[in-house]
Amino acid sequence: MYYQNQHQGKNILSSSRMHITSERHPFLRGNSPGDSGLILSTDAKPRLKWTPDLHERFIEAVNQLGGADKATPKTIMKVMGIPGLTLYHLKSHLQKYRLSKNLNGQANNSFNKIGIMTMMEEKTPDADEIQSENLSIGPQPNKNSPIGEALQMQIEVQRRLHEQLEVQRHLQLRIEAQGKYLQSVLEKAQETLGRQNLGAAGIEAAKVQLSELVSKVSAEYPNSSFLEPKELQNLCSQQMQTNYPPDCSLESCLTSSEGTQKNSKMLENNRLGLRTYIGDSTSEQKEIMEEPLFQRMELTWTEGLRGNPYLSTMVSEAEQRISYSERSPGRLSIGVGLHGHKSQHQQGNNEDHKLETRNRKGMDSTTELDLNTHVENYCTTRTKQFDLNGFSWN
């Protein structure tokens, strides 16, 4: 029993050793001993183990064909004539051979260069140092020439960039200056528009004041006719288109109304006992241009021998005028004169005295509007005519 168990154990060990040896040697020789020593693996895709003898025969075939660059797997297989070799085996081995040869060639070249340099250093004595320096200095310009060209190109590029930056900065400054100029122009335009708006507002205020005065006077004297501001504006536009220079002021509108409504005014003047002065318009315009002072119209309301003959036409004093008119509604006179001339003020007072004497004689029932009372003294003094070109609201 013991002998049998020992024998079985030996068999198991021997079988295990055989299995290990078979695993350790995966490449097996061909079936026949005359296969030229090819060792193939037992895989599904068998691989060839290149032995030194097989590799030498491969190198001989490659050299016969003219080198690794000219040799091909088919020609190598024909030259070698070993059965069992395939194109797959030869192709992979040829690629490896070419790579190794190129690497060896590069390494040999480097080794050769190093060896030559060491030999040159060993052979150069002290007497030949000048020649060696000349030889070393000679090829330096060729080596440094690409570097110098690159530096010059870089310097040129930097110079051009600097010029472009200068041009851009100059353009930026010009753009900023142009923007400031446009801003100043816009500010000036806004200021002028604001002034024009203020002027229009003043004209509107003057129109409102005039309409209030007309309404109050027309309420007291319904027989007397006054022009509305709209009619005055229409007459002003007609006057600008026909005869007079372009003046959109309220005074020019009032003066233009006399020429356009002459016939209707004649009837009204005859009915109210109004006396008008018929003069030359050109002479009137010349006198207006020659006069440097500012003319103003003053409405005067007189009561007997008392009262101020010249009152301003502000809206705040309208009530005072109405109170005077209520006391003496039959004594209405309009005096036109220049401020600063005492003689003209005295003449206006004389006119008021004349009107009072006429009213005492029996003319109190009618309203007399005297527009020009100094016709007889035209040669000695300046004529006083109903001219509203110098009229303004203060």
From Swiss-Prot:
**Quick one: a GO cellular component term?**
nucleus
Location of the motif LHEQLE = 161-166
Q: Which GO terms describe its molecular function?
A: DNA binding; DNA-binding transcription factor activity
Transmembrane ranges, per UniProt, are: none
Which SUPFAM superfamilies does its entry note?
Homeodomain-like
Expression induction or repression: Up-regulated by nitrogen deficiency.
Region described as Coiled coil: 148-168
Q: How does it assemble?
A: Isoform 1: Homodimer. Isoform 3: Does not form homodimer.
The function of this protein is: Transcriptional activator that may activate the transcription of specific genes involved in nitrogen uptake or assimilation. Acts redundantly with MYR1 as a repressor of flowering and organ elongation under decreased light intensity. Represses gibberellic acid (GA)-dependent responses and affects levels of bioactive GA.
The family annotation for this protein states:
Belongs to the MYB-CC family.
Q: What's the protein name?
A: Myb-related protein 2
* Gene that produces this protein: MYR2
